[in-house]
UniProtKB/Swiss-Prot annotation:
Membrane topology qualifier: Peripheral membrane protein
Gene Ontology CC, one term: plasma membrane
Family the UniProt entry places it in: Belongs to the UbiD family.
Organism: Chromobacterium violaceum (strain ATCC 12472 / DSM 30191 / JCM 1249 / CCUG 213 / NBRC 12614 / NCIMB 9131 / NCTC 9757 / MK)
InterPro entries, per the entry: UbiD (IPR002830), UbiD-like_C (IPR049381), UbiD-like_N (IPR049383), UbiD_bacteria (IPR023677), UbiD_Rift_dom (IPR048304)
Designated name of the protein: 3-octaprenyl-4-hydroxybenzoate carboxy-lyase
Gene from which the chain derives: ubiD
UniProt KW Ribonucleoprotein keyword: no
Gene Ontology BP annotations: ubiquinone biosynthetic process
Length: 491
């Protein structure tokens, strides 16, 4: 099923009993995090807190949480029937990322519908948009009226967590969508914590270099249709906008509205939109905050967004989440999006059989890759390829490469391969001074650290001078005989 806005998705989840309305008053200060964490760990439903309260004050906005708390709900949001169907989306992205010339007339004809569909999914602008039914400007702008979560006891302040941030570089037609957390530091001011390599930060840096004294327009969308939200966290090719990709997922063009104070465009049916500007040299110290690592992160300086106006629908819904020690919602998103990554990597490296990001590894810090090994050094080539091919894996610290007889998603098999097919000195690749997530306090320098590759494949001549072990396998005839006897054995 496809969803035109967040409310249609909520209605479908409720119909399938995958969403629970919480009528009991609950505070966004810590309580929602604890409830959401327990429900997510139990594989429970999305939550709609209908009576957010704090210190006796009742907010006018219900809070939607744990929306993508299971891989199945992520698949639903992307218009797929199940998680494995996400590989079809990955195959589409792999083709769009590196289209191949048709092998003949039939191949060209077969590819034509996809190309026509992509071209027809350019977003369209509408003049009247529900997201601008209500407008707060000037003194009316007050983030304190929104039930913004304060997630952990040691957090510095309330934190906007599901803000879909819209930016545009000075020489680009394409808008960038990214999800960056935002610390509230005033009634109309938030700190925009975007990492240096992310699209929003790159757009801002490029703009500031060309316009050192000009305020930079930014819009933040809080709550919109699931295809647009998930498009912002999917490895969309640079030739395709996230809005266009969302239309492809949804099967209909994304309807956009121009912001009231800039030429940026936002989803017309968004719940809440923050419009503002980043002024030159306006920076602030962000954090500390509990993060997806399970620890509080260090403080660092980031640009401040001054909010000029807040627009919204009638009876808007505030969409929120928390991050913490896995599993959390980003980890669950990683489990689902893992299936999108597999075909993209396989197109570049056909020898890859499977690729797995264990959620315990904070979604991206460790990858297990199985390959059909063909030559000495093959595992190392795959490691280097995974680190460099997609931006999403530039912060992956550990890559383990195994043979195709090992299930990458079974730790028992992976550990068996590591302990029987690896020599710690010969088969460990260490690289220093590589880009690392600045939240990784284990790195010696903020933003710069090491990577480790583990070659847990069977070794070939040229990689070892010893006779390699032969796996123990039971005789097929004996197995068939025992199968036939099994019911008589009483076991």
């Amino acid at each position: 099923m496809k969803y035109a806005d967040l409310r249609e998705f909520i209605a479908q989840l409720e119909q399938k009993q995958l969403l629970k309305r919480i009528k009991t008053p609950v505070s966004p200060h810590l309580e929602m995090t604890e409830i959401g964490d327990r429900v997510l760990k139990a594989g429970g439903p999305a939550l709609l807190f209908e009576q957010p309260v704090d210190n006796g004050r009742r907010y006018d906005f219900p809070v939607l949480a744990n929306l993508f708390g299971t891989p199945e709900r992520v698949a639903m949001g992307m218009g797929a029937d199940d998680v494995m169907q996400l590989r079809e989306i990955g195959r589409t992205l792999a083709y769009l990322k590196e289209p191949e010339p048709p092998k003949g007339l039939k191949d060209a004809w077969d590819k034509l519908p996809l190309l026509k569909q992509v071209l027809s999914m350019a977003p369209k602008e509408v003049k009247k948009a529900p997201c601008q039914d209500i407008v707060w400007e000037g003194e009316a702008v007050d983030l304190g009226k929104l039930p913004i979560q304060h997630c952990w006891p040691g957090d510095a302040a309330p934190l906007i967590t599901w803000g879909l941030t819209v930016t545009r570089g000075p020489n680009k037609k394409r808008q960038n969508l990214g999800i960056y957390r935002q610390q509230v530091i005033g009634k109309n001011r938030v700190i925009m914590r975007w990492l240096a390599h992310r699209g929003g930060a790159l757009d801002y840096r490029e703009f500031r270099q060309q316009n050192p004294d000009t305020p930079y327009p930014v819009a933040v969308v809080l709550g919109c249709d699931p295809a647009t939200i998930l498009g912002a966290v999917t490895p969309v090719p640079d030739t395709l906008s996230e809005y266009q990709f969302a239309g492809l997922l949804r099967g209909s063009r994304t309807e956009l509205a121009q912001c009231l104070g800039s030429d940026l465009q936002v989803p017309a049916r968004a719940e809440i939109v923050l419009e503002g500007h980043i002024h030159p040299n306006d920076m602030a110290l962000e954090g500390p905050y509990g993060d997806h690592t399970g620890y509080y992160n260090e403080q660092d300086s980031f640009p401040v967004l001054t909010i000029d106006r807040i627009t919204m629908r009638e009876n808007p819904i505030y969409h929120s989440t928390y991050t913490g020690k896995p599993p959390d919602e980003p980890a669950i998103l990683g489990v689902a999006l893992n299936e999108v990554f597999v075909p993209i990597l396989q197109k570049q490296f056909p020898e890859i059989v499977d690729f797995y990001l264990p959620p315990e590894g904070c979604s991206y810090r460790m990858a297990i890759v199985s390959i059909k090994k063909q030559y000495p050094g093959h595992a190392k080539r795959v490691m280097m390829g995974c680190w460099s091919f997609l931006r999403q894996f530039m912060y992956t610290k550990f890559i383990v490469v195994v043979d195709d007889d090992v299930n990458t998603r079974d730790w028992k098999e992976v550990i068996w391969a590591i302990t029987t097919r690896m020599d710690p000195v010969r088969d460990t690749t260490l690289i220093d001074h590589t880009p690392i997530d600045y939240l990784d306090f284990a790195s010696p320098i903020s933003g710069l650290g090491g990577k480790m590759g583990l070659d847990a494949t069977n070794k070939m001549p040229g990689e070892t001078s010893r006779e390699w072990g032969t796996p123990i396998v039971m005789d097929d005839a004996v197995k068939a005989r025992v199968d036939a006897l099994w019911s008589e054995l009483g076991l």
